[in-house]
């Protein structure tokens, strides 16, 4: 990247990007041995968005990513393309959207001052929008047919939901108005190695398998909210939980623990999404504690080896500053002995001054810390930050209501 600050500023402003943190070259003192891990909820990215290479919102998102230049990038809310997704074409391979994003946007420089980055994609099935066939919201209806999904607006903004879509989504294993909506994509630089045969996923783990499950109760009868047949099958993860081992050039394996728990809310007096969010976050605590109930989708039980370095990444939809008892799980995760919870990414002082209503560690426009890159305590942390645009660079159609969050780590020999 060129080092002339005014040249950079003008070029990046043209794509809605102004320096909100130090560029990669300035932030990392030893790039050869350092890894930048970043999470970014880009907000409801659809297959139809990714089939084209000129979607304005994705171009701006890609510019931000290229500026920050992560080695490992988790994108939340990218559709896992599959049958039932309105943008899916019969006969195409499933789960190809991460590759589309890497090819159409990230590999192509989004400004003269930026460089394209070559990433290898990891995209795996999720529960969102996959219908359960059960009445999970207790409204007396089961509507298993995907309704008509509104097309994307011409300005590139996020498509609206419909009542029919919400009715369908409320009975899916994780809320989504069509199969695969709000999925996840992990993108890893080509000079690192994804150990694909060792990936563990926990998409199918049933909630009742957790011994101390936070069971939602009907506030009138104080009986379990879910009917027995629904509770027997209810999955814990609203999207999925992934353990993706990434081998670094020196041979060290870094485990990427990726997830996107359900948002607390949108659920009525029983607060079933609060309960679920709590236990989805707690699943990572239990995984670090090597709990035996944690069984992956291949049938292997147990958690992460006690010496394994890792980063917990994703939009956890939980703010530790929220006094609710349901946020105890995220506080336990941050305070876990195996987690370096003292590292709190923050916005730069200049960007904080631009929006004083936000706390320095807020990662969402709606004033909350919900997006995380939590390094293990056996990693050396070199730098961290929350990237925010300047007010002058905010486009009429926002890229997302979340900000990119990044941490630079190094594995000590």
Predicted features by range, described:
Residues 254-276:
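Active-site His/acidic residue clusters
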Residues 22-184, 214-235, 250-254, 393, ...:
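N-terminal, active-site-proximal structural segment of metallo-dependent hydrolase catalytic domains
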Residues 54-61, 94-101, 179-183, 240, ...:
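Stable alpha-helical elements in mature extracytoplasmic
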Residues 187-211, 236, 245-248, 273-312, ...:
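Metal-dependent phosphoester-hydrolase catalytic domains
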Residues 1-9:
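Bacterial N-terminal signal peptides that target proteins for export
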Residues 42-47, 78-82, 126-131, 192-194, ...:
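Solvent-exposed loop/turn segments at secondary-structure junctions
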Residues 18-20:
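C-terminal motif of bacterial Sec signal peptides marking the signal peptidase cleavage site
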Residues 9-16:
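Bacterial N-terminal signal peptides
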């Amino acid at each position: 990247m060129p080092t002339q600050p005014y040249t950079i500023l003008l070029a990046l402003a043209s794509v809605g990007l102004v320096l909100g943190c130090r560029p990669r070259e300035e932030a990392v003192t030893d790039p050869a041995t350092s890894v930048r891990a970043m999470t970014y909820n880009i907000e409801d990215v659809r297959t139809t968005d990714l089939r084209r290479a000129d979607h304005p919102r994705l171009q701006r998102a890609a510019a931000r990513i290229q500026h920050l230049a992560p080695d490992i990038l988790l994108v939340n809310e990218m559709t896992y393309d599959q049958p039932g997704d309105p943008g899916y074409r019969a006969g195409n391979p499933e789960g190809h959207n991460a590759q589309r994003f890497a090819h159409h946007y990230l590999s192509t420089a989004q400004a003269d001052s930026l460089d394209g980055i070559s990433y290898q994609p990891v995209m795996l099935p999720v529960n969102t929008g996959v219908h359960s066939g059960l009445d999970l919201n207790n409204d007396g209806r089961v509507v298993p047919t995907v309704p008509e999904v509104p097309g994307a607006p011409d300005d590139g903004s996020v498509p609206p939901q419909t009542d029919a879509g919400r009715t369908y989504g409320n009975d899916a294993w994780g809320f989504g108005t069509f199969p695969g909506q709000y999925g996840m994509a992990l993108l890893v630089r080509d000079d690192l190695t994804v150990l694909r045969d060792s990936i563990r996923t926990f998409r199918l783990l049933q909630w009742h398998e957790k011994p101390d499950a936070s069971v939602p109760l009907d506030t009138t009868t104080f009986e379990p909210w879910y009917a027995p047949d629904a509770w027997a099958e209810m999955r814990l993860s609203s999207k999925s939980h992934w353990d993706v081992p990434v081998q670094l050039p020196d041979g060290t394996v870094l485990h990427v623990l990726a997830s996107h728990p359900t948002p607390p809310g949108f659920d009525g007096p029983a607060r079933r999404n609060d309960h679920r969010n709590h236990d989805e976050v707690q699943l990572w605590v239990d995984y670090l504690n090597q709990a035996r109930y944690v069984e992956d989708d291949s049938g292997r039980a147990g958690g992460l080896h006690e010496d394994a370095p890792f980063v917990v990444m994703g939009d956890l939809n939980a703010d530790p500053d929220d006094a609710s008892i349901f946020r105890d799980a995220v506080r336990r995760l941050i305070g876990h002995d195996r987690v370096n919870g003292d590292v709190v990414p923050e916005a730069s002082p200049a960007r904080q001054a631009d929006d004083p209503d936000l706390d320095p560690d807020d990662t969402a426009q709606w004033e909350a810390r919900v997006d995380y890159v939590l390094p293990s305590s056996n990693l050396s942390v070199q730098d961290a930050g929350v990237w925010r645009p300047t007010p002058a660079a905010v486009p009429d159609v926002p890229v997302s209501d979340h900000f990119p969050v990044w941490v630079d780590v190094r594995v000590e020999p």
